[in-house]
């Protein structure tokens, strides 16, 4: 009965206005009130502040600053094996496995369309048909920066407007096509393991989605699909990220979906639905063998992006809308 009530609220509540209100409140500097809210949040969700670079909650001027708090470098070591792809986020695995032609498993008895997830982009979908996927859910207590599973060259980013349903286990099991309905940012990379998509999915109360190369992607929520492209390789204007490097962040909890091309990687056998994930731990292994490179993988970045700063895109000249 309680679950039915919670699901009904997902359809009834004004999710967009709630999200805007939450984003507005989380960006305000309110002194002792901000600290009180953070302390209550830490206690309720059992947040481990010992892992944070700033464990003192009084250090955060806004709730958003606290929410995207950086971790100490040593608490998330990155697996250095060049054949291993690592987990992109702290959280739990919602689902993982093989993409069956165009079908991705959302929950037991519920599939959704790969092409719908990719906003109808059939050319991009063709890269991943019969490939592999991993869906990682970030709860409110988790670290909310998202990192690279492997070295990658950014080729395309698509912002897709959509609903703002919660993305917890209850909604995943009961809301059809949840991840293909919600607002999301699709990032396509060239990697040593073939093409890889890393998709940041929005949800109720998620105030914004950001990337390290373009700053805040949403808000504003303009209701139109936007697309950006970048050149390959070492060409001028290209964006290269290293394994373990931060690529984006959420302000409040959400979901990351990774897509891998067919025949390129095998997921770690021990992983299953509800497995706990930690950034830097093994997620998948290449089907080929690579020689260990001289360069070390990037540690967790120490440099901060201001929590309330809406950075201008670094590649405005590459932007076009569709």
Swiss-Prot record:
Activity regulation text: Inhibited by ionic detergents such as Barlox-12, an amine oxide, and sodium dodecyl sulfate.
Region (Disordered): 293-322
InterPro entries: PS_Dcarbxylase (IPR003817), PSD-B (IPR033177), PSD_type1_pro (IPR033178)
Domain of life: Bacteria
EC numbers for this chain: 4.1.1.65
UniProt keyword list: Cell membrane, Decarboxylase, Formylation, Lipid biosynthesis, Lipid metabolism, Lyase, Membrane, Phospholipid biosynthesis, Phospholipid metabolism, Pyruvate, Zymogen
N-formylmethionine modified-residue sites: 1
A cellular-component GO term for this protein: plasma membrane
Localisation per UniProt entry: Cell membrane
Pfam families from the UniProt entry: PS_Dcarbxylase
Signal peptide: none
pH dependence: Optimum pH is 6.5-7.5.
HAMAP family the record matches: PS_decarb_PSD_B_type1
PANTHER family found in the cross-reference section: PHOSPHATIDYLSERINE DECARBOXYLASE, PHOSPHATIDYLSERINE DECARBOXYLASE PROENZYME, MITOCHONDRIAL
Biological function: Catalyzes the formation of phosphatidylethanolamine (PtdEtn) from phosphatidylserine (PtdSer). Only decarboxylates the lipid-linked form of the serine moiety, and not serine alone or derivatives like phosphoserine or glycerophosphoserine.
Protein name according to UniProt: Phosphatidylserine decarboxylase proenzyme
Naturally occurring in which organism (per UniProt): Escherichia coli (strain K12)
Organismal lineage: Bacteria, Pseudomonadati, Pseudomonadota, Gammaproteobacteria, Enterobacterales
């Amino acid at each position: 009965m309680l679950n039915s009530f919670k699901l009904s609220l997902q359809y009834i509540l004004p999710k967009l206005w709630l999200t805007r209100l939450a984003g507005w409140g989380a960006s305000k500097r309110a002194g002792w009130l901000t600290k009180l809210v953070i302390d209550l949040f830490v206690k309720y969700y059992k947040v481990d502040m010992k892992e944070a670079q700033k464990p003192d909650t009084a250090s955060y001027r806004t709730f958003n600053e606290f929410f995207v708090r950086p971790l100490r470098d040593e608490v998330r070591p990155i697996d250095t094996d060049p054949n291993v792809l690592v987990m992109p986020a702290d959280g739990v695995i919602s689902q993982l496995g093989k993409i069956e032609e165009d079908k991705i498993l959302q929950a037991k008895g519920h599939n959704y369309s790969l092409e719908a997830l990719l906003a109808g982009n059939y050319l991009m979908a063709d890269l991943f048909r019969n490939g592999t996927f991993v869906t990682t859910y970030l709860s409110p207590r988790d670290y909310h920066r998202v990192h690279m599973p492997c070295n990658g060259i950014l080729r395309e980013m698509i912002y897709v407007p959509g609903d703002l349903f919660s993305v917890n286990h209850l909604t995943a099991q009961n809301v059809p096509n949840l991840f293909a309905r919600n607002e999301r940012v699709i990032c396509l990379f060239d990697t040593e393991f073939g093409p890889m998509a890393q998709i940041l999915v929005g949800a109720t109360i998620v105030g914004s989605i950001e990337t390290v190369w373009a700053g805040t992607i949403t808000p504003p929520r303009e209701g139109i699909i936007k697309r950006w492209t970048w050149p390959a390789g070492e060409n001028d204007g290209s964006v290269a990220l290293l394994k373990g490097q931060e690529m984006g962040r959420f302000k409040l909890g959400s979901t990351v979906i990774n897509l891998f091309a067919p025949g390129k990687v095998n997921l770690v056998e021990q992983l299953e639905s509800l497995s706990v994930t930690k950034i830097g731990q093994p997620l998948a292994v290449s089907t080929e063998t690579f020689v260990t490179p001289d360069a070390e993988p990037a540690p967790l970045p120490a440099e901060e992006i201001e929590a309330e700063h809406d950075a201008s895109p670094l590649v405005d000249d590459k932007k076009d809308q569709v």
